[in-house]
């Protein structure tokens, strides 16, 4: 009997999470079926992280015991021939029989992706949370500092979680912003004449649902001749068109903890919570003080590194 470790990547869109459930498609269920078919044994894998419905992974870990004579490193190719296209074994290897993916000391890295622009993009519909607000990235980065270190994260855990302790250590928490490119809105009419030029800024409160009734600054350049308007140039400014990634590394995470961290940082970005409040929110250990749980589709388990 030998123990095989699998590094698993998957798109969680079409699955009811990792853990086997009756009458539901799950990642664990698909792995059990493929491995059992390959080995001729009744296999049940043990997973490191039981991700929720809609959550994705680049490097979740699972193990199973088998008497198969297939070399450990060969399982990845053989299983990928049997698994659906949205589940891929990145690596397979034989490990010590006492290796346990859930109880072994490790560091986990998660990433939460936000598409920040006026309208959604179809290619990100299953892998990023869409937010059209004018998010303050610097404020979000500043708020990250309060999370670093060992804290009681009871306020960042969904109700019903059964754990011995809510104390966890976060080694790093970063907010990265990648511009996708912008669209400059500009309307103007021109007339060649000697005239007075006037520039001023106008704040317009939009009524469009997509703009969330927020104030939008517009720059206006007027040209006047004998107090008569002969030319006007309106510059609507640069629309947000970016991907924001919240990346966190820690020794373990409570139920929905990363999604609640992401939801809280979004509240900071929107100006609803000041970065300076974050330390008190964590110390309160009160779920009501933290932000909402961000949607599952933006979350991805990037890596589990055993130490």
Residue ranges of each PLM-predicted region?
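Structured-RNA-binding interfaces characteristic of tRNA pseudouridine synthases
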Residues: 1-207, 215, 229-307
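Repetitive helical segments and hydrophobic/amphipathic motifs
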Residues: 221-222, 235
């Amino acid at each position: 009997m030998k123990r095989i470790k699998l590094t698993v990547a998957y798109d969680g869109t079409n699955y009811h999470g990792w853990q086997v459930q009756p009458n539901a498609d799950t990642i664990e269920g698909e792995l059990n079926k493929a491995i059992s078919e390959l080995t001729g044994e009744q296999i049940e894998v043990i997973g490191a992280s039981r991700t929720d419905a809609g959550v994705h992974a680049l490097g979740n870990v699972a193990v199973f015991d088998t008497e198969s004579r297939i070399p450990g490193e060969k399982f990845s190719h053989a299983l990928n021939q049997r698994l659906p296209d949205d589940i891929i074994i990145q690596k397979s290897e034989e490990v010590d029989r006492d290796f346990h993916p859930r109880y072994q000391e490790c560091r986990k890295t998660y990433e939460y992706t936000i598409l920040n622009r006026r309208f959604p993009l179809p290619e990100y519909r299953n892998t990023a949370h869409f937010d059209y607000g004018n998010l303050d990235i610097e404020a979000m980065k500043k708020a990250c500092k309060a999370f670093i270190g060992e804290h009681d994260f009871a306020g960042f855990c969904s109700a019903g979680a059964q754990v011995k302790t809510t104390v966890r250590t976060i080694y790093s928490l970063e907010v990265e912003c990648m511009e996708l490119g912008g669209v400059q809105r500009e309307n103007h009419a021109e007339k060649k004449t000697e005239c007075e030029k006037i520039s001023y800024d106008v704040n317009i409160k939009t009524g469009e649902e997509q703009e969330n009734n927020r104030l939008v600054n517009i720059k206006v350049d007027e040209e006047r001749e004998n107090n008569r308007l002969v030319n006007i140039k309106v510059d609507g400014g640069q629309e947000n068109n970016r991907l924001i990634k919240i990346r966190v590394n820690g020794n373990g995470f409570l139920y929905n903890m990363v999604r609640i961290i992401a939801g809280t940082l979004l509240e900071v970005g929107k100006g609803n919570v000041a970065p300076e409040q974050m330390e008190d929110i964590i110390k309160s250990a009160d779920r009501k003080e933290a932000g909402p749980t961000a949607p599952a589709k933006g979350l991805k388990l990037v890596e589990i590194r055993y130490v």
